[in-house]
Each structure stands twice: as C-alpha cells, then as structure tokens.
C-alpha cells in the first residue's frame, strides 16, 4: 500500500482510483502482446473493490526465505496419513474400504452405485485391467459356473499370479522411468545391450508384489545395499545392482564421438534428476537448474543440493561412460572355464595358421613356376623379405609381378577360386618345358658328333615323322639312342629337367584338387565352435559410486558447463 516512486499501486476498495488497475485497463500492462481478457480485467476490478484481500498478511519486507508458508503447505508435500473411513448408510455390503470413499462422494452428489455387473462382464473388466488381455472362453465359463462364495477373490488371485500382470503394470513404471533400449542424445542412438535386465527387474518386482519402499530404495541406492567388491554376485546382489538401472535410463551421449563431453555429461545428470523427481516427487525441478523455480517451491540452491547427492556416482569431472559403468556377472568358475577354452581356441588357431602358411608356400611355388627362370630366385627372396627390409630393387620387382606380391592369408580365397585356370597354366608350362628338354637332348647329341656327314644325315631323319620313317631310318636312329628320347626316357638323358617337369605336373594336380578356401573355412568353423563354448559374459547396467570418491559440489550458472 505504501507503493513506490509513483505512490500506492492499489487504492483498497476503489479500483477506479488504483494505479495498478488503470495501467491494466488501459492496456499498458502486461507489457507487449500479453493482453488480459475483459473477464480477467473485471476479476481484478472486483478484487480491488472488495478490499484486495490476500490469503495472509503481506510482510513489510521480503525475507531471505524464498517460499512462503502457504507454498510449503501444498498438499503434495504433506506426509501420507491414514484417513478415517467415512460412515455411510448402505443397504448392501461393500467389498473394499475404497468403496466407502467412492460411495460417500456419490451420495454427496445424490448418486449411488449401479447394479453389480454380471460375471461375464466382471471377468472381462478384471482381465483387461490386470493383464491387458481379454479372457478366453474357458476362463469365462469357469468363473461364471464357480459357485464358491469367494469366486471373485479366486479370480483376482489367479490374474495377479499371472506373469502377464507384471508385464501389464510394470510398463507404466517403465514409462515413468523413461525406459529405453538405446542411449539417445545423438543420431547414432547407440543400443543399450543390457538395459533389458532393468525392464525384467521391474516386471519381476510387480509379479512378486515387492513392497514399494523396497522398490524405491533398491532403484536409488541398490549399490549401497550391496557389499563390494562386485564379484561372484549372489542373486540378491544382482537384483539390487540391476535396480539402479533406474538412474541409467536418461539419454547418455558420453559414450559417443563428436559430442561436447562437458555438455553431454551435465545433460545426462540433469535428465537423470528429471527422471528421479518426476517419478518419485511428482513434479518437475528442471527450471531450478538455472534459477529459482517460478511456480513450485524449488530453489536453485535446493536443486544443486539434490544434485550433490548424486555427485559421487555421477561426477561430471570424473565421468564414467556407459561401457565403464557395466558390472560383469562373470563368476570365478566362468573365468576358469573361459581360460581353459581359450587355450583350446589358441591351439586350433595355431593349427589353422600352419595350414595357411602351407597354402601360402604352395601358392608362391605355383606362381614362381610361371616366372622366368632367371627371376624365380630373386622373386622368392623379395617376397620372403619383410616389407620394411626390402631393397628398392626387390620392391620394384614385386610390383612388376603382382600375383606374387599379393599372396597373403587374406587373398588365398581369391587364388583358390582361380585354381582351375592356374593349374592349366602350370600344366602348359610343364608340357612346353618337357618338349624343350627333349629337343635339347637331341640338339646337344647332334652337336657332339664329329662326323658332319653323319650329323647331317641324322638331322634329316629326325625331320621325318616317326610313323613315316622306313626301316633303314629306324635302324640308323637305333644306333643313336639320345635321338630317340621321349617324355618317358627324358630322365635318362636330363634327370634334373625331367624331375622339374614332374614337379610342375604334380604342382598342377595339387593346385587343381586343393580348395584352400574350404579348408580354411572348415578350420575356422572348428575355432568358432570351440569359442562358442565360452560362457557368455552378461553385464549389469548399473549406477555405482567409485570407492573413496568425494567430488566437489558446484553451483552452475546458466550456460556454464565446464567450470
């Protein structure tokens, strides 16, 4: 009433003389385009004309207390109390105390309960309500024909004992908790592989009728209820740690690349606080993150006091990414079994590597067959020299022969697919080499004859096809056995070349009949089958406090994420 520089803003009982009302009626207030309706303006006028009364006396000065006593008495902040059941005159028995409250309200409106629904409708209502599914015909018939006085109670018990009950009603809490199977925050939306365990925990809690206070405690502090270290966990310990997945349902981009880590961490904390308060307090506190809440009695100081409770487990300056927060469910026995199997895996892997090395050596030999004789040994040495130790000449030589340079464990599949063509090439080389060797034996023998006339005569006979030679020519050649050399007798005159041709032909046969790809795949399947025996390692997506960790508490200012 004292007012400011312009005097009192309200003239009690006289709106027409009130500075505040005149400003509102003229449209000067509220500012900009937030104009009040005629009805709202009339309400203000009546309030001033009727004395401008307030719920409580206005203080002479504003205290440091941010919230009034009236705000602190808001109904949602009051402890739960057991109400007296209203006494209501009823002509029929009521089945639940809740019915008395309902009937009392109905009577205040001059209403009453409708007639009791027939059993066919009751079982449908119950089934849809508790399971979200309609009853089948057998269940309906059984309930309708059940003459027991507690038939309804029996039906309720049967539906509550159904696994579908937890699935039906657990999903409502999962919605409140913001359950998600992926991290969100980024477009990658990384999968949360182990989030389902928290979902199953909630469903099981409903099905086992877990007390609500225990349900809340385990979700907020399951790690504090579990003895460290988190090894060889018993079923109860697993349950409590799994329950803390409640505090891990907020979007978390800290495990993704390309994000501002400080922003992502603080957003994850803020979203977790939002999940906790909206579900357990029934109110949003996000406004108090940057300033005192404008509508609810939540100060910015209170917000960061609440955040400080979470700081040991969610320390933005010593952050743990989603993968770092996982708790392994591997037992000591699992580790022993895994180690034993991994020894077998390594043995099978070593055996496969021996086969790979054998195929690499074989493929190198086959490719060297196709190279000129004078380059065979240089190419072999160049290939067998490690890349970092090769000379420039060796590197250049291999570059000119890519089919040798590219031989590796990874490329054996390609060489295996081409084995038919490669074996034909090797066979052709062996054939040509054999013919050249036979011709060489004959040529060297003729050159060794001293009598030129004999040499000339024998050369002329050789020009005649063997099937067209006469007896005289055959007798003449019979006296000079080297000139009758064939593939079968080549070893008598050039053993080294005959052996080489035989090796080439054997290599061609092996190349044609050896499927390196299949052999390596079969060995890999053996390795995979052994590795599949390793017990699968499951994890708990939990929120835990690092041991001996006491972070500092910060009061952030708007937009400040890093100081």
Which positions does each model-derived feature cover?
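Aromatic- and Gly/Pro-enriched helix-to-coil junctions and flexible linker segments
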Residues: 1-223, 293, 313-444, 452, ...
């Amino acid at each position: 009433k004292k007012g400011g520089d312009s005097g009192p803003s309200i003239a009690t009982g006289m709106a027409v003389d009130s500075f505040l009302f005149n400003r509102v009626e003229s449209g000067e207030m509220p500012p900009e385009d937030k104009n009040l309706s005629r009805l709202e303006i009339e309400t203000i006028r009546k309030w001033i004309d009727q004395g401008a009364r307030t719920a409580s006396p206005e203080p002479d000065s504003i205290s440091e207390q941010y919230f009034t006593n009236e705000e602190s008495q808001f109904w949602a902040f009051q402890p739960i109390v057991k109400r007296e059941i209203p006494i209501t005159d009823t002509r029929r028995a009521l089945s639940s105390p809740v019915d008395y409250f309902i009937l009392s309200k109905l009577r205040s409106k001059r209403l009453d309960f409708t007639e009791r629904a027939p059993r066919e409708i009751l079982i449908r209502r119950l089934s849809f309500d508790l399971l979200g599914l309609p009853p089948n015909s057998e269940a309906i018939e059984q309930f309708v024909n059940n003459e027991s006085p507690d038939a309804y109670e029996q039906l309720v018990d049967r539906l509550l004992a159904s696994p579908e009950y937890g699935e039906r009603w657990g999903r409502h809490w999962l919605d409140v908790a913001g359950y998600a199977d992926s991290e969100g925050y980024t477009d990658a939306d990384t999968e949360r592989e182990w989030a389902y365990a928290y979902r199953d925990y909630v469903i099981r809690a409903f099905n086992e009728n877990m007390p609500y206070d225990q349900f809340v405690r385990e979700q907020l502090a399951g790690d504090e209820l579990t003895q460290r270290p988190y090894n060889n966990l018993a079923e109860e310990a697993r349950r409590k740690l799994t329950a803390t997945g409640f505090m891990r349902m907020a979007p978390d981009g800290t495990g993704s690349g390309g994000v501002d880590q400080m922003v992502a961490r603080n957003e994850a904390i803020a979203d977790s606080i939002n999940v906790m308060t909206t579900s357990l307090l029934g109110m949003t506190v996000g406004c108090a993150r940057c300033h005192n809440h404008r509508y609810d009695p939540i100060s910015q100081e209170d917000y960061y006091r609440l955040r400080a409770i979470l700081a040991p487990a969610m320390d933005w300056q010593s952050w743990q990414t989603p993968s770092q927060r996982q708790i392994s469910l591997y037992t000591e026995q699992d580790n022993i079994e895994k180690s034993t199997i991994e020894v077998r895996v390594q043995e099978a892997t070593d055996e496969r590597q021996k086969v790979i090395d054998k195929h690499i050596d074989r493929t190198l030999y086959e490719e060297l067959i196709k190279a000129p004789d004078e380059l065979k040994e240089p190419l072999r040495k160049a290939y067998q020299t490690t890349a970092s130790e090769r000379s420039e000449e060796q590197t250049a030589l291999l570059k000119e022969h890519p089919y040798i340079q590219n031989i590796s464990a990874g490329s054996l599949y390609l060489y295996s697919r081409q084995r038919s063509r490669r074996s034909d090439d090797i066979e052709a080389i062996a054939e040509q080499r054999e013919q050249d060797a036979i011709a060489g034996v004959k040529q060297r023998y003729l050159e060794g004859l001293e009598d030129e006339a004999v040499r000339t005569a024998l050369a002329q006979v050789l020009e005649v096809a063997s099937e067209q030679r006469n007896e005289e020519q055959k007798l003449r050649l019979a006296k000079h056995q080297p000139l009758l050399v064939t593939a079968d007798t080549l070893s008598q005159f050039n053993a080294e070349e005959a052996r080489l041709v035989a090796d080439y032909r054997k290599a061609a046969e092996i190349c044609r009949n050896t499927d390196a790809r299949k052999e390596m795949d079969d060995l890999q399947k053996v390795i995979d089958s052994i590795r599949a025996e390793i017990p699968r390692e499951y994890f708990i997506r939990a929120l835990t406090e690092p041991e001996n960790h006491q972070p500092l508490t910060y009061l952030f200012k708007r937009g400040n994420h890093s100081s």
